[in-house]
């Protein structure tokens, strides 16, 4: 049922203190409205939770971004455009900057606010896992004064929070302690832009001496609230990376979440995606180690276009991908680089994908199935392929024969070689995957092969940055 505008009262005080006083006079009666991106949706459905609306849009006390030596303090009224364009947010809190760029379209980013996203309490909100990973603190204000609350403790259930009826979020505080961490984020949705997440991940980690010194992994759309994977983090911290640890981390992460079946996805799919994303993050973290990526990126950012494209070509094998990546420089950090790689790859043509596929050897062989792209450093690509297929190369003769037979059947059916991210997978696992994928139709299999190539490219980029 639609609502009647005459049933609502709307006022716009000129100061934060006036808003706080109003909320204190009638706790729970007034609904603060910032950018109002959800107002018309709720209004049209007759689901606005209050009849009295008070505007907090454009209040100067809520729109600042203050930077000190120890922390950055983001006003709750700052928009996603403010966040994605802010220099310190981009350089030191890239997970949040990337999430801001994912949130809706440009119009939504110009109006939507970080504080509003937090209070709206959607478990699918893109920015909230980043706040969990960075261990944000909220500053809450009311007529009773000010209090700080860890963001991790803010959500108590689906669409439920610890915000009192007379309180507002004034600011979000992030400590500046993660500049040495690798940042990893990914959003899985029905399309590349303006889509509600099926799963989103924000993770940071730091290696020291081959051991995971620190790790924080947060997820959205997999539980009634945004979720930190505490058990998975405890499993990984202090450990060196082994295939068995990655396998156990995949299992632990999938068991730690509480996904549901809904209009966007299924619980089973979400669990599988979470396992894959956690494994990918760990592999990239391991490949990067303790390297200072800024030096590698700074050098590559300054190369001529052709030289830059040729240098990263072995990571993927597609000239289209390599040249588009080189044309997007400079990249501020590895998170931005990897995000651009994913987006560039997804927007290539099927012909570009096939070019990348042809640069790989068949599973169980050492030479590319067809000639590698021109200008590719084939020796580097060959070395990486051997590393990726190490377990297959060590398998028995019977299994290699079965793999060769399945490869032939696959190529006859789909017209290109079988592509799988083989890192950490045993030969029997790969053969089982190959046989399962033989049941796909051509379009489904092409997209699955492209997804596997995306994962391979990410891992190889980590190795390239480590050279």
Regions inferred by a protein language model and the residue ranges of each:
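C-terminal structural segment of proteins
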Residues: 1-293
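C-terminal non-catalytic interaction appendages of large macromolecular assemblies
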Residues: 392-467
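Alpha-helix boundary/capping and short turn/kink residues
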Residues: 89, 105, 318, 330-331, ...
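Aromatic-anchored, charged helix-turn/loop surface patch used as a conserved interaction hotspot
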Residues: 294-315, 320-406, 456-467
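Short acidic alpha-helix initiation/capping motifs at coil-to-helix transition points
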Residues: 76, 224-228, 300-304, 315-318, ...
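Short, residue-level hotspots on alpha-helical faces of the histone-fold
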Residues: 275-280, 284, 343, 416, ...
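Residues at or immediately preceding the N-termini of alpha-helices
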Residues: 16, 93, 243-246, 305, ...
């Amino acid at each position: 049922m639609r609502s009647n505008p005459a049933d609502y009262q709307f006022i716009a005080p000129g100061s934060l203190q006036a808003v706080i006083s109003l909320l204190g006079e009638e706790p729970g009666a007034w609904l603060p409205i910032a950018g109002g991106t959800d107002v018309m949706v709720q209004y049209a459905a007759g689901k606005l939770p209050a009849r009295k609306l008070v505007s907090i849009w454009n209040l100067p006390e809520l729109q600042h971004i203050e930077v000190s030596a120890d922390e950055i303090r983001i006003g709750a009224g700052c928009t996603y455009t403010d966040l994605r364009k802010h220099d310190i947010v981009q350089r030191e809190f890239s997970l949040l900057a990337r999430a801001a760029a994912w949130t809706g379209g440009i119009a939504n980013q110009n109006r939507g606010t970080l504080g509003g996203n937090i209070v709206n309490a959607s478990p699918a909100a893109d920015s909230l896992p980043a706040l969990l990973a960075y261990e944000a603190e909220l500053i809450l204000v009311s007529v009773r004064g000010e209090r700080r609350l860890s963001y991790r403790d803010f959500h108590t259930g689906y669409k439920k929070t610890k915000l009192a009826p007379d309180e507002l979020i004034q600011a979000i505080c992030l400590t500046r302690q993660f500049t040495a961490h690798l940042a990893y984020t990914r959003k899985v949705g029905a399309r590349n832009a303006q889509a509600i997440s099926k799963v989103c991940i924000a993770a940071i980690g730091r290696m020291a001496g081959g051991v995971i010194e620190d790790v924080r992994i947060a997820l959205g759309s997999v539980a009634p609230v945004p979720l930190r994977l505490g058990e998975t983090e405890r499993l990984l911290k202090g450990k060196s990376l082994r295939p068995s640890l990655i396998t156990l981390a995949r299992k632990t992460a999938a068991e730690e979440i509480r996904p549901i079946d809904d209009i966007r996805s299924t619980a089973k799919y979400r669990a599988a995606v979470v396992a894959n994303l956690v494994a990918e993050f760990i592999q990239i973290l391991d490949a990067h180690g303790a390297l200072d990526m800024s030096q590698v990126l700074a050098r590559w950012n300054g190369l001529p276009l052709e030289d830059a494209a040729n240098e990263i070509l072995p990571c993927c094998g597609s000239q289209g991908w390599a040249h588009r990546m080189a044309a997007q420089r400079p990249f501020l950090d590895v998170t931005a680089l990897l995000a651009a790689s994913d987006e560039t790859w997804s927007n290539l043509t099927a012909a570009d994908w096939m070019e990348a596929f042809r640069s790989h050897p068949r599973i169980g062989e050492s030479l590319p199935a067809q000639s590698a792209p021109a200008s590719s450093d084939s020796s580097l690509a060959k070395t990486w392929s051997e590393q990726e297929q190490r377990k297959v190369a060590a398998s028995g003769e019977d299994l290699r024969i079965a793999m060769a037979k399945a490869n032939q059947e696959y190529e006859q059916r789909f017209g290109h070689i079988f592509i799988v991210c083989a890192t950490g997978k045993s030969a029997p696992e790969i053969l089982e995957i190959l046989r399962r994928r033989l049941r796909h139709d051509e379009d489904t299999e092409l997209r699955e092969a492209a997804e596997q190539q995306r994962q391979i490219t990410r891992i190889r980029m980590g190795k390239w940055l480590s050279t």
